[in-house]
Amino acid sequence: MDFAFATAPGSERPNEDHVVVSAGQAIVLDGVTQLPGLDTGCVHNPAWLVRELGDCLARALAAGPTTSLQLILAAAIDELRTRHAGRCDLSNPHSPSSTVAIVRSRGEQVDYLVLCDSSVVYENADGVTVVRDDRTDTLPAYDRHTVGRLRNRPGGFWVASTDPAAAAEAVTGSVACSGLRRLLLCTDGISRLTEFFKLAWTDVFGIAERSGPHAVIDAVRRYETDQPDLLARVGRGPVKRHDDATLAVLRRRTADRHR
């Protein structure tokens, strides 16, 4: 199995999303945007982090094709620490970080992992399943002090940054290849189609199948422009008018579709 993908920045800023695809696997990352004036203790930015983490994950997946995805992620974060090359304070709670979504074909199974608010969505005979780590939805507050205090802590939320232990908190699972109809991985710049604009995931799959993954991003931009008033969360800070958006969509061979 292989994947088609698309990614686009939400503004003139560098794209802080990243996608890596190869035969039988896909990785989607969403770097956490740094607040202005926040001391991160790091000389690097989120765009650097997602590129390096993507490379670390690809290397770990190649080295351990049957290793659990949690261990793959832990190894990648551990390698990522060395790439800071001693120039950064890796104990800083605001160090650059990223969400993670991984899908890997393994024999007759497809394994998946999700950390923080990126998503894996698939459809089989049981219907559409959305795999998402929703712990950021229930924080007691969203100011920078509270978020920093609860990041990668029990009772808080978990991201890929400088602590390999975060990998053990990822949401993981497997689904049989047989009967798997459709699958995608995406950042929250794509899932806002369903969260805010109330499309069904079957609609998103349909756009991708008819016109390709870039058309899904085009749909996001149209909704962001035409219905910006829907971009709101109760009890949360303002939502970006335009966010970085990335997705990887499974392209199944004809023979696979008839298995």
Where are these regions (language model features)?
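A short alpha->loop->secondary-structure connector
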Residues: V121-D133
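Short amphipathic alpha-helical segments
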Residues: T40, A125-G127, F196-L199
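Catalytic core of PPM/PP2C metal-dependent serine/threonine phosphatase domains
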Residues: L53, A62-E123, L150-C177, V239-H242, ...
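Short glycine- and acidic-rich boundary segments immediately preceding or forming the N-terminal edge
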Residues: M1-R13, A76-H84, T136-V159
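Helix-loop-helix
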Residues: R51-R81, D203-T225
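Residue-level marker for buried hydrophobic side chains located in beta-strands
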Residues: I27, V114, L183-L185
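C-terminal catalytic subdomain
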Residues: A4-A6, N15, V21, S105, ...
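N-terminal entry segment of metal-dependent catalytic domains or homologous docking segments
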Residues: M1-L57, S118, A165-S174, G189, ...
